[in-house]
């Protein structure tokens, strides 16, 4: 972080080693310096309860396909006061309230002012159903079950002599490991 830093963008849970980052503390630190925080929730939102109010992040993004939903749909959460200050780069159908001439364009209220054209209606409906399904199970239960499965798998993998587990103690269900004499990307 330098005096020129305007945005900190980071994953809440890394997809490589599975560490859960202290987002609340990072946001507090950043906000003291006037820095915005953008959180990648792709590996956290589908697997644990995430409360944007508690975290105090400025933006959080995640995708439907990692939550049992369709591809091509996602969410960008943003604090309302920040979203209201965003102006679209391009304009499209459904964004403008009135269009008197090219120099006088009045945009609709959020979220419509930032969403041009016909949305992926089927995808959004499918994503909504996926979210309902996961919420009916309960994100705490999902996280608890994933952690039990992780512990079980680590218990089995640790007994295999040619496997080296990199992140035995991580707080997510992501397990990173190496197989002796095999390039990691080939294993993946």
Cite the ranges covered by each PLM segment.
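Pyridoxal 5′-phosphate
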Residues: 1-188
């Amino acid at each position: 972080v330098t005096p020129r830093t305007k945005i900190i963008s980071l994953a809440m849970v890394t997809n490589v080693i599975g560490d859960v980052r202290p987002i609340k503390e990072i946001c507090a630190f950043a906000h003291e310096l006037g820095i915005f925080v953008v959180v990648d929730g792709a590996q956290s939102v589908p697997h644990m309860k995430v409360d944007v109010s508690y975290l105090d992040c400025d933006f959080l993004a995640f995708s439907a396909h990692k939550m049992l939903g369709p591809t091509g749909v996602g969410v960008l959460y943003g604090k309302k006061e920040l979203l209201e200050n965003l102006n679209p780069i391009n304009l499209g159908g459904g964004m403008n309230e009135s269009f008197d001439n090219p120099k006088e364009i009045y945009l609709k209220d959020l979220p419509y002012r930032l969403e041009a054209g016909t949305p992926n209606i089927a995808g959004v409906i499918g994503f909504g159903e996926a979210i309902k399904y996961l919420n009916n199970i309960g994100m705490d239960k999902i996280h608890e079950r994933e952690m039990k499965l992780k512990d079980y798998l680590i218990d089995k993998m640790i007994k295999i002599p040619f496997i080296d587990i990199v992140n035995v103690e991580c707080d997510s269900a992501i397990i990173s490991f190496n197989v002796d004499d095999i390039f990691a990307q080939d294993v993946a």
